[in-house]
């Protein structure tokens, strides 16, 4: 009766109080954007009077960037796997504008450079990976492409593999279609 309902309310508030700080940390300290738009075709971004022109001319838009995102699978040397989203930007400086790359313990900054391959902490832990380890990304053609991990970043809500433009082009075999 009343005791059961009261218990459910307390549990609900407890869950809310334990989740909200994580959401706040992710959205205020680690990810810095107000909106993400998924594109079905890069032409929506680049055509005349397309999204890029609209964003450039809007006084409400402080900054924007073209990104590539795609779900894929990572594999470690032992055959363990994890599903992740690859994230790369048309301009590498956008990566550090929209994402903070740092360690969870100590908040040491992780540089984002031309050869960066940064994995979220929980995924690296689940695959038993450390900085300098080689792992494999399943490419669009089904082949597994080796990458060397350059950083393990604090993260709470997503499983992501952040790649520099050079690493992304190497993985894809050319310039990606910017879809986000």
Predicted regions and their residues:
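Short beta-strand boundary microenvironments
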Residues: 25-26, 49-63, 67-134, 146-148
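Alpha-helical transmembrane segments
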Residues: 4-33
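Small-residue transmembrane helix packing/gating motifs
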Residues: 30-31, 111, 152-180
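Conserved short loop/turn motifs at secondary-structure junctions
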Residues: 4, 34-45, 70-72
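A short beta-strand structural signal in non-transmembrane regions
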Residues: 34-41, 123-124, 150-152, 175-180
């Amino acid at each position: 009766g009343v005791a059961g309902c009261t218990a459910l309310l307390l549990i609900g508030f407890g869950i809310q109080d334990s989740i909200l700080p994580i959401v706040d940390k992710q959205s205020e300290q680690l990810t810095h954007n107000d909106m993400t738009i998924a594109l079905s075709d890069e032409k929506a971004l680049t055509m005349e009077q397309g999204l890029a022109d609209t964003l450039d001319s809007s006084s409400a838009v402080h900054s924007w960037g073209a990104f590539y995102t795609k779900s894929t699978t990572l594999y470690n040397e032992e055959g363990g796997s994890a599903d992740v989203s690859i994230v790369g930007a048309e301009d590498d400086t956008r990566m550090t504008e929209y994402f903070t790359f740092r360690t969870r313990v100590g908040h040491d900054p992780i540089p984002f450079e031309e050869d960066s391959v940064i994995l979220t902490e929980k995924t690296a832990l689940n695959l038993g990976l450390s900085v300098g380890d080689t792992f494999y990304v399943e490419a669009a053609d089904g082949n597994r492409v080796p990458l060397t991990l350059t950083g393990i970043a604090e993260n709470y809500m997503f499983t992501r593999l952040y790649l520099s433009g050079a690493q992304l082009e190497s993985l894809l075999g050319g310039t990606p279609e910017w879809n986000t």
